[in-house]
A protein has these predicted regions:
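The feature captures the beta-strand-to-loop junction immediately N-terminal to the Walker
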Residues: 37-39
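ABC ATPase nucleotide-binding domain helices that frame the ATP-binding cleft
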Residues: 45-48, 144
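Helix-to-loop junction immediately C-terminal to a conserved catalytic motif
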Residues: 52
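Conserved coupling/switch loops of ABC nucleotide-binding domains, chiefly the family-specific signature
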Residues: 58-61, 111
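Conserved ABC transporter NBD signature motif
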Residues: 60-68
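ABC ATPase nucleotide-binding domains
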Residues: 78-79, 88-175
Length: 175
């Protein structure tokens, strides 16, 4: 796990009045569960994208364990983001979607297969590996997206409304 610190994190866009995120300062201790709460448009997703390296801040800093990560590419940060709208590859099976990041990192096929099977079991989808995303419910697709993030064993896991498509029972189980 990793200590995350946001210092005066700000994001402005040219031609827009005000900041999308204005001087957010936050310490997130290693191993903790932290929720960013607020109304739509207040900058929660913007902050997470900057932590993950998917968006550059206009000002401020993001540090992991005391080291700035602003110049690190997203894949080198060890932060993974799960988006509300899944972003699954429609032409890949569930198993291939979950194992995609491992394959891109050059992991051996046997390791990819074993870790994908393990994580699909953890998100309660052990038999859906051969299926295509279009054959899944919204809640199942959300769990595949979560599995795709978890299989990488990230230092920082960022979840943008990850439980929104799950029924009440599954929501409790996935927590």
């Amino acid at each position: 796990m990793t200590d995350v610190r946001l210092t005066s994190l700000t994001k402005t866009y040219p031609g827009e009045a005000g900041a999308a995120l204005d001087a957010l300062t936050l310490d997130i201790p290693s191993g903790s569960l932290t929720a960013l709460l607020g109304p739509s448009g207040c900058g929660k997703t913007t902050a997470m994208k900057m932590i993950a390296g998917l968006l550059s801040p206009s000002a401020g800093d993001v540090t992991f364990d005391g080291q700035s990560v602003l110049n690190d590419p997203p894949e080198a940060r060890g932060a993974v983001m799960v988006f509300q709208n899944h972003l699954l590859f429609p032409h890949l099976s569930v198993a291939d979607n979950v194992g995609f990041g491992l394959r891109m990192r050059g992991r051996p096929k046997a390791e990819v297969r074993d870790r994908v099977a393990e994580i699909l079991g953890r998100v309660r989808l052990p038999d859906l590996g051969p299926r295509m995303p279009s054959e899944l419910s919204g809640g199942q697709q959300q769990r595949v997206a979560l599995a795709r993030a978890l299989v990488l064993r990230p230092k920082v896991l960022l979840l943008d409304e990850p439980l929104s498509n799950l029924d009440a029972h599954l929501r409790l189980e996935m927590r």
